[in-house]
Each structure stands twice: as structure tokens, then as C-alpha cells.
Amino acid sequence: MESSILKSPNLSSPSFGVPSIPALSSSSTSPFSSLHLRSQNHRTISLTTAGKFRVSYSLSASSPLPPHAPRRRPNYIPNRISDPNYVRIFDTTLRDGEQSPGATLTSKEKLDIARQLAKLGVDIIEAGFPAASKDDFEAVKTIAETVGNTVDENGYVPVICGLSRCNKKDIETAWEAVKYAKRPRIHTFIATSDIHLKYKLKKSKEEVIEIARNMVRFARSLGCEDVEFSPEDAGRSEREYLYEILGEVIKAGATTLNIPDTVGITLPSEFGQLIADIKANTPGIQNVIISTHCQNDLGLSTANTLSGAHSGARQVEVTINGIGERAGNASLEEVVMAIKCRGDHVLGGLFTGIDTRHIVMTSKMVEEYTGMQTQPHKAIVGANAFAHESGIHQDGMLKHKGTYEIMSPEEIGLERSNDAGIVLGKLSGRHALKDRLNELGYVLDDGQLSNLFWRFKAVAEQKKRVTDADLIALVSDEVFQPEAVWKLLDMQITCGTLGLSTSTVKLADSDGKEHVACSVGTGPVDAAYKAVDLIVKEPATLLEYSMNAVTEGIDAIATTRVLIRGDNNYSSTNAVTGESVERTFSGTGAGMDIVVSSVKAYVGALNKMLGFKEHTSTLSKTPLETNEVPA
């Protein structure tokens, strides 16, 4: 059964990344003509007491939303695309994105995100690095068996990809994980820049070419018909050498050539020229798809990705919210919406198969599961992305929304109503709560709704009005939590200026048995965390602690995020360096009491860590050194 609880509000048809066109008639032969949405958007414009300009939206059954151009996703063939303007979206949130510090995901969370990515319509899901650990292998395999075999009514099913270094053990492990998907892919890589050859691999150019050629051929020999090859650090590699090694892996059977700007050093003009040069000078390039993978070290990942697509790349590698190692990766939402807004006008008619109205919900899921908060001014999905505070901008928006809005919030699935609709409060019932959650895009099962309803009533008793932001915080705290090894039942805090703070905490274990502990600390949170530690008995170090108010006012709900590292050295293998890295675990909590939300966050992080420990208790990995010669 599908465990994801997110859906885009009132959606049924895919968005194919192009500006709105006149409505199709009912007699249109477009395969999407029967999927028009029968709803109408109503906009309420108001000024808050802080002088901030807000736009609220609601939906009512009436006339259709603006339709989408009748461009179809081409049938999937690994090494070619029938429509020269179609750009494949390769999402690596579950692999490169998870390498962000503190972004450790459980197997269930990875599966939820993969299902949501399929709803979004990504062409390829890089589900992980199977050789990193047994847990990673099982997560990729599960995604291949489930998401990789779920075909929608239009025949769409995502490619499920596993990453591997250029050695037989990694490649065999990747194939064993992804082979259960209808469309499996192996993505193998080896460095090609002089600095990597000299200091990391300690190999000659000829040796690396031989390894790359043999390993691509080996991947094909396993029965995998879809093999992607990446020359790591291509942005700093010698051009003639790139043309040579890429030509050799094409002859060996590669179907996609991914060109990574691994350290994010190139400028858009440079990266676009790199793609153009590879397209013009690589033997056999017409028989493969060119891909981009741009890191964000100089803040240019989105620009470089678009430049690469404009120069001929027809696959782009991205992550939700741009998460990833160091400064992150090219952001899916930015790249996709740039192509949608400017594809026809500037990029020669490029388009994607992404249903953009699932963007906000996918972004929220990744944010909650990873614990990595999206900055307010983040393009497309940031809290301020559609806020207007300047008086001049407000005046323009009141006169015509197009003066300062290049896309509508509805295009990305953003819902902001309630200002002109039903106000939720202490007298609201379960049905009203469920309806509003559905409008916001959240579908909860009966158990989740029941638990949330009583938390909603508790908040409503203390607040005159429960806002959408409050609801989203409560939903996130209820359903975006790891499987409970420990559950917070009750707690009591005594604090003040006369002495040490004291805390009594009651937790329930997975069998329902209650445990109570008391402790003192330098503050209420410190005392509570020490009491939790006395019960759980799993040593951990608190690395980060942050808190923010979801809404304004003294009665605001607070969300807390913590990042911990287990003292028992939970580790996995870094896909790029091959080194063993210590895993960190994040947790989030929400509540009107900041100490309670803090303890919920800490218990959530501990549950993640304990869940990882359980999954890897029989770990049987043997990491290969990055300079090992494949057999």
C-alpha cells in the first residue's frame, strides 16, 4: 500500500512545461483533452497588519484551469529521444541529495519520496548508491520493485537508477538492486581531471580509459541495456581526453553520457560551450543522450544546467530544493520552471514531462524528511517566493498580477486560502479539518486523522483561529516522523532563576511499556534531553539545535529541528570519495510549548538513529578503495 500522504490539490493532468495556450476544444484529439480540471481560482488580496502584501487562493467547481500544450512525453528509449526538444529530468535527491550533512533518510522515507517523485513525473529516479551499505541496497531494491513497476494510465513508469564506481563489485551490487524495475539503469563513474588522476586515482589517462571501457562493457554484459557513464570533474578535465574517453564508453555500450561540473567551478558560458564541444567532437555522440550534473559551489548550478540544455544536453540531473553535498545541486523546481516559463521563448522550444503542480508538496516532503529547512527567499518554493511587500509592487499587483508575477502559485501547487473561506477554530469538526487538509494537498488515513484532530483541538482551544501554517506544522509533526522506537507520553519541567532546571519525562517503547526518568540541567531543554538519555541509553552528541515560529504572535506554534551524531559511529560509504563517513540524524517537532517541541525533535532524531542501527545490524559491506584496480 502506498504510504505517501501527499497529493497535489484538485489535480488530474500533467503539466508539460510550456506557457498557457488557448483552451482545447472538446473535440480535440489531444490525449489530455479529457483531463482538464473543472475548477476555478479565486484570488483575495489583502494587507497584513505588518504591511505585508498577501495573496490568498481558493478553488471552486466551475470553469477549467488554464490548459496545457498538447506535448506528449516521448516513449522511453535509453539512448535516444524521438522529440528533439524533450528534456529528461533525472532526480538524484535520494542519492546526491542525501549526502547533505544531516539528511539521512530511513528506507520508508526514501520509498515515500520516490513515490512522490513518480507523481511529479520525473523520468529517472537515482534511488541511491547500493554498494554504500546493506540499508542503501535494500532501499534501492524496494524502490525498484515498487515504484519501478507502477505504470500509470499513460504508460509512464520512471527509470530506477543505481550509482556505482567503476569496479565490478559496485556494478554487480547496483544491478542486483535495480534489475527488478521495468526500466533499470546503472550509473557508473570515474574521475578524468588531471588533479583527480594524479592525487586520488594515481593512474594514467590510458589506465582510466581502459577501466571505463571495461566497466561499461561489464555493466552491459549483466543484462542492463541502460548504462550511464560520468567522467567525474569533467568541468576541469582536458577536452581532447574527454572526447576520447567518452567515445570509448559509447563503443562499449553507454547510452547516456553525464557531464558533471563536480566542483561547481564553471560559468554558464563555459559549461554551455563544454556541452557544445562534446557534441561536436565525440565519436558516436549521436547514439547517446548527453546529460548535465551541476554543483552549486558558485551559485550557478541552475544557470549552468540551462546553458547545457540549450547547447544540446537532453537530460538534466537535479535535486528537490537543490540539496546535496557542500553548496548543493541544481534545483529541480528552478530548472523545470525556467524551462516552463522560458523554454519556448529563449531555449528553442524545450519542455519537460513534469507535473509542476506537485512541486510544492514534493518540496515540503523532502524538507520535512531531511530536516533541511528551505530558506524563505528560495526561488519557486521559498515562503517569500510569492510575497510582495513594496508599496510599488503591491500597487502593480492590484492592477494586474502580471506586473510582478511571472508564474502563478497554482502552477506549482501552492494553495493559500481560508481568508475568504472557512475559518477553523475550536468549534470546527473532523469533517471540516479533513476537507481543509485535502485542499492543502494532504490525504491522511483514519488513524492519522484521528490523532491529528485531537492535537488540532488542543491548539484551537488556545488560539482563536488555526491558520494553514498551523495545520501544515501539525501534519508534518504527525506524519513526517520516523517509525517510533520511543514515543513521548508526558513531561514535567521546573525551571527559573533560583537553581538548576529539573525535568521528568515519560516515554513508551515499541512494546508500549512506559519508562520514567528525572534529571537536572542548565536549562529546561538540557534537563529534558538528559532525562530522555537516561531512558533510551543510546549515547548521542547534539550537533545542531534550531527553532522558529510558524506563525506570528505569542500563541504561535514553534517548530524545532535538531541534528545528532551517534557515539557508536554509524557510518556509510561516500559515493564520490569512497571514504567511510559518519552519519548524522535529524529530527523535527512542533508544538505551542517550545520545550515539548524540542523533546519531540530529539526523540525523533533518536528514533531515526535507532532505526538505522536496526537496519544495519547485519551489515555486510566491504567498501572498495577508490584506487583499487577492478578485476
UniProtKB/Swiss-Prot annotation:
EC code(s) of this entry: 2.3.3.13
Summary of the tissues where the protein is detected: Expressed in roots, stems, leaves, flowers and siliques.
Residues bound to a divalent metal cation: 96, 293, 329
Subcellular location(s) of the protein: Plastid, Chloroplast
SUPFAM superfamilies: 2-isopropylmalate synthase LeuA, allosteric (dimerisation) domain, Aldolase
Metal-binding listed as a keyword: yes
Consequence of gene loss (knockout): Plants do not show any changes in soluble amino acid content.
InterPro entries: 2-IPM_HCS-like, 2-isopropylmalate_synth_dimer, AIPM/Hcit_synth_CS, Aldolase_TIM, LeuA/HCS_post-cat, LeuA_allosteric_dom_sf, LeuA_bact_synth, PYR_CT
Protein encoded by which gene: IPMS2
Pathway where it operates: Amino-acid biosynthesis; L-leucine biosynthesis; L-leucine from 3-methyl-2-oxobutanoate: step 1/4
Domain Pyruvate carboxyltransferase: residue ranges: 87-360
Activity response to pH changes: Optimum pH is 8.5.
Family named by the database record: Belongs to the alpha-IPM synthase/homocitrate synthase family. LeuA type 1 subfamily.
Protein name per Swiss-Prot or TrEMBL: 2-isopropylmalate synthase 2, chloroplastic
Highest taxon in the source lineage: Eukaryota
Pfam family, one: HMGL-like
